[in-house]
């Protein structure tokens, strides 16, 4: 009995504190993404395709979640990429995602198609197609 009373007496004076964790800041390492210029068989749309790709690249970099891979490092051409990416070529330059697309004249409008690929899984994540006037290209770039 004395033994039990001693244990109860000791337990009364034990102070229990919760474990406290303080996280001062998190770090997010930007994901490498390759953003190609939009491919077009029509040379008059080449500059517009470059402008759209540039705006998309700037938007993704400003988010802090992505870092663009320098397009001088690209192995596969835009023309061959419009069919199917060679994922091994993109793994060599250490990119995790690939954003490619095409731009075409469609009467007095343009059609813009984007495809986002996961390089390591070797599959398309998403694909979108937009149709707009040439003057509205910047708005489509921000979508």
Locations of regions flagged by a protein language model:
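Sec-dependent N-terminal signal peptides
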Residues: 3-14
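Amphipathic beta-strand/beta-sheet edge segments enriched in Tyr/Trp
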Residues: 20-23, 81-142
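Short, solvent-exposed linear motifs at loop/edge-of-secondary-structure regions
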Residues: 30, 142-143
């Amino acid at each position: 009995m004395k033994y039990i009373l001693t244990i109860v007496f000791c337990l009364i004076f034990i102070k229990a504190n919760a474990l406290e964790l303080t996280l001062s800041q998190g770090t997010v390492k930007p994901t490498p993404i390759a953003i190609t210029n939009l491919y077009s068989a029509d040379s008059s749309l080449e500059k517009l395709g470059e402008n759209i790709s540039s705006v998309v690249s700037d938007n993704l970099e400003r988010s802090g979640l992505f870092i663009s891979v320098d397009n001088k490092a690209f192995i596969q051409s835009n023309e061959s990429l419009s069919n199917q990416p060679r994922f091994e070529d993109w793994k060599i330059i250490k990119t995790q995602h690939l954003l490619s697309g095409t731009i075409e004249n469609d009467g007095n409008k343009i059609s813009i198609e984007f495809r986002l690929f996961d390089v390591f899984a070797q599959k398309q994540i998403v694909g979108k197609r937009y149709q707009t006037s040439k003057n509205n290209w910047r708005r489509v770039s921000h979508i």
